[in-house]
Amino acid sequence: MKKRILPLVLALLLAASLTGCAGRTVSGEPYKMYMIVKSTTTEFWKSVFAGANAAKSEYNVDLTVLGPETEEDYEAQNEYIRQAIRDGADAIVFSAISYTKNAQAINDAASAGIKVVVIDSDVNSDGVVARIGTDNVQAGRMCAKAALETNLESIVVGIVNCDVETQNGQEREQGFRAGLSGDARVQEIYTV
């Protein structure tokens, strides 16, 4: 289901992010859009790229897709944002590695007149014009509910949060912890 809806969401995302860039439409020049994500190798991001590539022709978009080699390299993302600013991008579609450490670069892009749309993983910036993502607190609660569907009398929980720098990682853990909090069987919660 997610793979079928994603191209539609990305087409809408492209249209929304380019609102206000009418000057390029009149001249026939393509919109310059950068898609800067957390990774270019996972199946999730490959499906996002497929949707963006499907929509770019319809919306006359010159699309540059960039992402670091690891999902921890927020500085590479910041450099890609600076590259988009230097290149005169009209819009950036962005998924933050760090909610806080990517904020200044996004603020700089917005100050340069670039429309910024966040997908999947948010950034602490007022310069973002649209956000598309999951209700991560609710997703965490749903995971907790599934984890509690056991007949065990005592439960010790270990949380491995590999996205602790991202807002979505923090919110998922928050929702998971909240979902566990009402069950007396939960004895201890460890986070690594």
Role assignments for model-derived ranges:
Residues 21-192:
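A residue-level marker of the well-folded mature domains of exported/periplasmic proteins
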